Amino acid sequence: FYLAFHQTMPAKAYMYPYPYEDYTELKVRKYGFHGTSHRYVSGVAQEMLGKKDSKIIVCHLGNGASISAVQNGKVVDTSMGMTPLAGVMMGTRTGDVDPASVIYVMRKRGLSLDEMNNRMNKKSGILGMIGTSSDFRDLDAAKKAGDEKAILAYDMFCYRIQLYIGAYVAAMNGVDAIAFTGGIGENSVGAKKQICEGLSFFGVELDEEKNAKR
């Protein structure tokens, strides 16, 4: 998971608003994951831009997914948190949810901590929404076949990524490039198109021909 690349995040980004002693005594804070991928891809994007002063958003999209804001080669913020459960919707993980909803589901279903942890990490996300697979290729096929749950899950996946991209444009006061990587980021022409179509306000333009190449 390689955490080191994310250690340049400022305290305002990595701190959680728990009682401060939870940070000092328990080290509860955002750490971030997929560091090797974010470091490499942001570096390549920076080289392609040909300038050191750059604002790059990296979208690592696979069964696990994370977004990072990288300014001048340093991470400003990232979507995963203390654990890989935080952030955008993933193959089997919830991503961000209302913390109180966790308590509610546990009480209503009589789940233990371990059972709820397993539910959120292994049984949610795309798998939880469509009930048959966590593979984005299966989701895409079901969407194209007109499955309503698949269409909703696909839209949710793209929407949550758009939200993070928008937030990170604000965090860096602009963006020079958005880089996609990971199995979905490299291969899903449709997902990249849908994500970028909602970002035209930021001046994002998708080259359809290049997007179709893998």
PLM regions: where:
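Conserved phosphate-binding/catalytic loops in two-lobed NTP-binding clefts
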Residues: 189, 193-214
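Oxyanion-binding "anion nests"
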Residues: 106-132
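Glycine-rich phosphate-binding loop of actin/hexokinase-like ATP-binding domains
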Residues: 5-106
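Beta-strand segments within the central parallel beta-sheet cores of soluble alpha/beta enzyme folds
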Residues: 55-59, 114-123, 177-179
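Adenine-nucleotide phosphate-binding core of ATP-dependent small-molecule kinases
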Residues: 118, 125-129, 136-171
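Glycine-rich phosphate-binding loops at beta-strand->alpha-helix junctions
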Residues: 62, 176-198
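Phosphate/pyrophosphate-binding loops at sites that engage ATP/ADP/AMP, CoA/4′-phosphopantetheine
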Residues: 45-50, 165-176
